[in-house]
Amino acid sequence: MRIWEKIFGTYSQRELKRVIPIVDKIDKLDQTMQKLTDEELKNKTNEFKERLSKGETLDDILVEAFAVAREAAWRVVKLKPYREQLIGGIILHQGRIAEMKTGEGKTLVATLPAYLNALKGEGVHIVTVNDYLAKRDKETMGAIYEFLGLTVGVILHDLEHNERQEAYNCDITYGTNSELGFDYLRDNMVVYKEERVQRKLNFSIVDEVDSILIDEARTPLIISGQGEKSTEFYKVADYFAKSLIKEEDFTVDEKASAVMLTDKGIEKAEAYFKLENYADPENMEIQHHVVQALKANYSMKKDTDYMVRDGEVLIVDEFTGRVMDGRRYSDGLHQAIEAKEGVNVERESKTLATITYQNFFRMYDKLSGMTGTAQTEEVEFREIYGLDVVVIPTHKPVLRIDNSDVVYKSEKGKYMAIVDEIVETHKKGQPVLVGTVSIEKSELISEMLKRKGVPHQVLNAKYHEKEAEIVSHAGEYGMVTIATNMAGRGTDIKLEEEVIKAGGLKIIGTERHESRRIDNQLRGRSGRQGDPGASRFYVSLEDDLMRIFGSDKLKGIVEKLGLGDDEAIESKMVSNAIENAQKKVEGNNFDIRKTLIQYDDVINKQREIIYKQRSEVLEGADLKDQIQEMIRDVINSVVDSHISDIEEEFKEELDKLIKFLEDIFLPKDYIKVEHLENLSNDEIKEKLYDIAKNIYTDKEEEFESEQMRDIERVILLRVVDTKWMDHIDNMDHLKQGIGLRAYKQQDPVQAYQFEGSQMFDEMIYNIKVDTVRYLFRVQIEKAPEREQVAKETSTNQGGDDTLKKQPIKKEPKIGRNDLCPCGSGKKYKNCCGREV
């Protein structure tokens, strides 16, 4: 502990001193609240809403509101938030992260700030990591809010559109991070505002906040459509990758999770794909397929990174061990893995809309979170999200004994020792939870235990349907549970009396994770609410963490000691070496996430501009003036780009200008070079704008004014969506190659910002051009089938009534004040228009 922390206390301790007086005030109201009838307690909600409408703030009513919610919780679910939970609730209301250990009742804590903030009527989202927890929390805690007169909804994966709208319109809405994010993206793809489901993003309480905002931070949410590229090349690239020899043709950088061809490998690629120079930019597509095939075959591990079930490649979450349904690796990696595994290769998709969790959750007016482990990532929460972490004291002291790590030379020796430890613990009846890092490792231990005759249950991605049930049994007398990482997080492991006598739940970690936080989560499964327990991690020098990031000094000591497979060492120096390796990885991952957000901020600002303008269009703003402005901008831009100051080329330039404008809005041969050759650039612009305005006025006469406004809106939205999708792809391609700018002594992030901005300006211009083009071409179309039916009907009936109802297709009309198309230079009404 630093010297000033010894004198002044930690940051959390100092913050708690400010909160405790508020908790004391809530405590003092306890007796008053108990005396209220149910009706009087319920009426408090309307009283608070009225006070807020008269100018009081949420902080003004916090003490009373918390006291009301506390009493309601006791009456409805027979749970009364204790002081530590009140502290947690206040920290959440303040828009911070409350670190609360496992079993401290985070679900109940969330009800306090949720009730208070819902009183404003702007909505509160309580975010969990899966549908099961969202549904469970809504069912258990929803009754408290409903008792107090508030509405509660839950967003689940299979909800219909109107059910989603209903759930979001509730005062408090439970849902998963992915569903909330996807609904936001879908809302920004609709054509009618009535199709939107979400309201403004007001206040969010994120459960397991570290899992969502840090572990998932690099995972973009993507809504995609079917791509057009063939998948055959993935199979060709896979065949090539499988023919290569490690170290000779390619090298694997495990720290960077990268696989690279050697010079010899490049020669083989040139021979295999019949290329002159593999590095040529024209061979970029081949390079991309080869890189992904190499990564799929030599970096991605089956039953660790992914699993194959029913002929489908499924991603396994490295942090939770859960299958991530509906997710696919991007950039063709998923297709490369499908080719590797010999299953059906699906087409690469086209991204229609995308956002990262980092940027989605930063859009909330107020954001807060709860987790059992946040302190190790305190700097990241503060720097990226502006959230500080406050550690909430436990209700009862933690009695769990955390033993120091045991280090073995080989994996074989480590696993033998783990199994021996499980057997001995099982004999005493003490339950054991064994944490593994992959499906493969969990099945290895399971097999070893079977040979020893030890009954056990396995929880990994293959058995995820039974997750809650398996976890609920993990604390039973004599139970042995093998689980990948943090599967079962969010479900408490409760202990019976005889288990407490046997020493509580024992945690065995089979290797250290890259992040200390994940290790702490595993430990935190034991010792909840003052229960006894123990934890220990078993490590070998062959573990990925030690092999890739461990210090040579530690390896040297183990070699000098001449340890056998079944011999272990325990020392402070060993524990420090392991922690330093973890800090190294955490720092590396933090830097990656920081860089990612610098890149993502560029497209995020662009996304905000597009979605804001899109929203204004949806809200039914009259677009006529905006469309006229677009027409003027397009004409000005086209004239400026076509007409130079070179006299000799003027006529040729005018000819090209007219042809270009004929592709956008001018009817063919409507205007000739001689009509413009004696005018200045500004006069040309004005003349063309007047012509466009007249043509557009005639176009409006084909439709009713209201119908035309609707057409403008739909066309503009469709053009914006199409151009935005293409822009996302282009920005992605730019990002993939931007790292090479470092070789030119350019900052890749600055280069990405500059070029991304140019591409965005170009997209905005193209939106204007296409919108104008489509609006000038829009016609009342008649379908051929209908036309035939109409003819037959009119012949049979002999009347003209049906003819009036037929769709009418009109040709572009010449306005009376337009230039006559004969080329005379006179107005139409004074020339050929007279004859008409």
From Swiss-Prot:
<dbReference type="InterPro" id="IPR014001">
    <property type="entry name" value="Helicase_ATP-bd"/>
</dbReference>
<feature type="binding site">
    <location>
        <position position="85"/>
    </location>
    <ligand>
        <name>ATP</name>
    </ligand>
</feature>
<feature type="binding site">
    <location>
        <begin position="103"/>
        <end position="107"/>
    </location>
    <ligand>
        <name>ATP</name>
    </ligand>
</feature>
<dbReference type="InterPro" id="IPR011115">
    <property type="entry name" value="SecA_DEAD"/>
</dbReference>
<keyword id="KW-0862">Zinc</keyword>
<dbReference type="Pfam" id="PF07517">
    <property type="entry name" value="SecA_DEAD"/>
</dbReference>
<dbReference type="GO" id="GO:0006605">
    <property type="term" value="P:protein targeting"/>
</dbReference>
<dbReference type="Pfam" id="PF21090">
    <property type="entry name" value="P-loop_SecA"/>
</dbReference>
<keyword id="KW-0067">ATP-binding</keyword>
<dbReference type="GO" id="GO:0005524">
    <property type="term" value="F:ATP binding"/>
</dbReference>
<keyword id="KW-0479">Metal-binding</keyword>
<dbReference type="InterPro" id="IPR014018">
    <property type="entry name" value="SecA_motor_DEAD"/>
</dbReference>
<dbReference type="InterPro" id="IPR011116">
    <property type="entry name" value="SecA_Wing/Scaffold"/>
</dbReference>
<keyword id="KW-1003">Cell membrane</keyword>
<feature type="compositionally biased region" description="Basic and acidic residues">
    <location>
        <begin position="801"/>
        <end position="816"/>
    </location>
</feature>
<dbReference type="Pfam" id="PF02810">
    <property type="entry name" value="SEC-C"/>
</dbReference>
<dbReference type="InterPro" id="IPR011130">
    <property type="entry name" value="SecA_preprotein_X-link_dom"/>
</dbReference>
<keyword id="KW-1278">Translocase</keyword>
<dbReference type="InterPro" id="IPR027417">
    <property type="entry name" value="P-loop_NTPase"/>
</dbReference>
<dbReference type="Pfam" id="PF01043">
    <property type="entry name" value="SecA_PP_bind"/>
</dbReference>
<feature type="binding site">
    <location>
        <position position="832"/>
    </location>
    <ligand>
        <name>Zn(2+)</name>
    </ligand>
</feature>
<comment type="similarity">
    <text>Belongs to the SecA family.</text>
</comment>
<dbReference type="InterPro" id="IPR001650">
    <property type="entry name" value="Helicase_C-like"/>
</dbReference>
<dbReference type="GO" id="GO:0005829">
    <property type="term" value="C:cytosol"/>
</dbReference>
<dbReference type="InterPro" id="IPR036670">
    <property type="entry name" value="SecA_X-link_sf"/>
</dbReference>
<keyword id="KW-0811">Translocation</keyword>
<feature type="region of interest" description="Disordered">
    <location>
        <begin position="786"/>
        <end position="817"/>
    </location>
</feature>
<protein>
    <recommendedName>
        <fullName>Protein translocase subunit SecA</fullName>
        <ecNumber>7.4.2.8</ecNumber>
    </recommendedName>
</protein>
<keyword id="KW-0963">Cytoplasm</keyword>
<dbReference type="GO" id="GO:0008564">
    <property type="term" value="F:protein-exporting ATPase activity"/>
</dbReference>
<dbReference type="GO" id="GO:0017038">
    <property type="term" value="P:protein import"/>
</dbReference>
<dbReference type="InterPro" id="IPR036266">
    <property type="entry name" value="SecA_Wing/Scaffold_sf"/>
</dbReference>
<keyword id="KW-0547">Nucleotide-binding</keyword>
<comment type="subunit">
    <text>Monomer and homodimer. Part of the essential Sec protein translocation apparatus which comprises SecA, SecYEG and auxiliary proteins SecDF. Other proteins may also be involved.</text>
</comment>
<keyword id="KW-0653">Protein transport</keyword>
<dbReference type="Pfam" id="PF07516">
    <property type="entry name" value="SecA_SW"/>
</dbReference>
<feature type="binding site">
    <location>
        <position position="492"/>
    </location>
    <ligand>
        <name>ATP</name>
    </ligand>
</feature>
<dbReference type="GO" id="GO:0043952">
    <property type="term" value="P:protein transport by the Sec complex"/>
</dbReference>
<dbReference type="InterPro" id="IPR020937">
    <property type="entry name" value="SecA_CS"/>
</dbReference>
<feature type="binding site">
    <location>
        <position position="831"/>
    </location>
    <ligand>
        <name>Zn(2+)</name>
    </ligand>
</feature>
<comment type="function">
    <text>Part of the Sec protein translocase complex. Interacts with the SecYEG preprotein conducting channel. Has a central role in coupling the hydrolysis of ATP to the transfer of proteins into and across the cell membrane, serving as an ATP-driven molecular motor driving the stepwise translocation of polypeptide chains across the membrane.</text>
</comment>
<feature type="binding site">
    <location>
        <position position="822"/>
    </location>
    <ligand>
        <name>Zn(2+)</name>
    </ligand>
</feature>
